[in-house]
Amino acid sequence: IPPAKDGLLPKTFELINEDEPCAGLEEINDYFNELHISDGLPIIPPTKARYEKMLEYCPFDEDMVLCDPSGPSGKCVTVKDVAIAAVMAGCKPKAMPVLVAAFKALNNKAYNLNQSVTTSHPGGNLVLVSGPIAQEIGLSGKQGCQGPGWPVNATLGRAVNLVIMNVFRSVPGVCDLDCIASQAEFTYCFAEEPDLAEWNMINEDHYDSETTTVYVLKAEPIHDVIDFLSLNGHDLLDTITHCCSTLGSNNAYMPGPLVVCLTPDHGKMLKKDGYTKEMIQEHIHTYCYHEVPMVRNR
């Protein structure tokens, strides 16, 4: 079933079968995989009806450019590209405002988009949403939020990576130069949880509690921090700091931004011992380093 000139699949009435409603889905997925316009997981066919439904939650013109030309293809990303990927990923239309904001953020020069879509580092395109829209659409920051079982997290993050593959043509093993890649390149999306936050969330730091913000970062896969014995915030913070730049990680050699996710009990411990968010940030950025002999010739 070749796509139409506009890149969308035609309405596939010929595949409708009352005895087998999903007849043809396997063939569609095989076709997308052959063209390297899928991530290997089953996709929802981006029919015209589904595409138009997705745009109902997007007030922008479908040809509006969200990202400048980048990546191996040298193409720009439009609202249309994002809506198609959102359908394929299984997103609900309510996710469109977050996706549009995410690609506007990816277009910020500080993100270094062109390098991020071809790097050999197996990082994913982390999307962190703060504010009321996250809760309205079901985006989670609760226990297990970066694993399976959270459909909004999974599909929204997946849509971001489908756009990067399909529009920028950052195809694994071709122009995506990861050595073995990682699960973070399938999906990497979660929210700040207001009921669990011990300090202001990102949206409150920059705007207010009624505004929703979308923060993006090219980030390595989850780096677990294990500390069973610390009984005070200072010792716990030292453990966290040491994990932020372990030898062999990018941050040991090329310092960059960090996202530190605190569990509720760790957040409570740090706040109880008098730490503010700014104090935690300052501590990490002061002590997150290695002595020169440790990194020389590595």
Each language-model region and where it sits:
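Non-transmembrane, aqueous-exposed alpha-helical and coiled segments at domain scale
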Residues: 1-298
